[in-house]
Regions:
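Non-catalytic accessory segments flanking enzyme active sites
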Residues: 1-37, 70, 81, 104, ...
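Short, solvent-exposed loop/turn segments at conserved positions within beta-propeller repeat blades
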Residues: 2-6, 47-53, 94-99, 140-143
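Extended hydrophobic/aromatic segments used for targeting, binding, or gating
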Residues: 18-74
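Conserved loop/turn motif of beta-propeller repeat scaffolds
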Residues: 39, 86-88, 131
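Hydrophobic beta-strand positions that form the internal "hydrophobic ladder"
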Residues: 42-44, 89-91, 134
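Feature representing long, continuous alpha-helical segments
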Residues: 53, 66, 87, 99, ...
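Generic long, charged, amphipathic alpha-helical segments
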Residues: 66-91
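A cross-family structural signal marking well-folded subdomains
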Residues: 88-93, 100-102
């Protein structure tokens, strides 16, 4: 209602003659975004009891709230995007105003950080659920947009394209991340970007 992001969830089994909708999450208790399924386990991104986001699974054969499982728990960093790959769950976080991608193995839920050490913003993640390859865009204060391909199976990353700006070389500039303490002691992340010869 209005700008309220909370939602209910219904599903329909098209394999049966009775095609009536079945309530899975009947209460307005949070935001639930359906990600996909692994058999009878339905996976959701949710902010239910997790303001910064988490991933849960609900078995449609045993959907009571007490049986919900947390697959990826809430962290101190905001979970901003989730994609299902063939063998991994891709989680994009905002950590100190920079993007970070973690991959969780669907079977063991062991996690690994992708081998991409640039600080900045990742966007436009594109993939399919039958592949462990995904694509993304990257930019920061001194780097024009770049597009990468990442293979989660062998951790190989390839630069596919980068925007060329006439008379501009990113290597001529420096961008540093610093942390400034506020009055209450909280460390505030900030960037200082400048030309090398200044």
């Amino acid at each position: 209602k209005g700008t309220d992001e909370r939602n209910r969830v219904f599903y329909q089994d098209l394999r049966t003659e009775n095609n009536s909708f079945i309530e899975l999450i009947p209460e307005l208790i949070g935001q639930f975004i359906f990600l996909g399924n692994i058999g009878s386990e339905f996976l959701f991104f949710t902010d239910f009891k997790a303001p910064k986001g988490k991933i849960i699974s609900i078995n449609i054969n045993n959907p009571q709230k007490t049986n919900w499982k947390t697959l990826v728990a809430e962290t101190d960093d905001a979970l901003t995007r989730v994609e299902l790959l063939d063998n991994y769950i891709l989680c994009q976080y905002l950590k100190d105003v920079s993007s970070e991608i973690l991959l969780f193995n669907k079977k063991t839920f062991s996690k690994k950080k992708i081998s991409f050490d640039k600080k900045g913003i990742i966007s436009g993640i594109t993939t399919t659920q039958d592949s462990d390859v995904f694509y993304f865009s990257f930019t920061n204060y001194i780097q024009p947009n770049e597009i990468y391909q990442y293979n989660a199976t062998n951790d190989r990353i390839n630069l596919l394209w980068k925007k060329q700006v006439p008379d501009y070389r990113p290597a001529d500039y420096i961008s540093k991340q610093l942390f400034y303490p506020s009055k209450d002691g909280t460390l505030i992340p900030m960037y200082i970007s400048y030309k090398k010869d200044i």
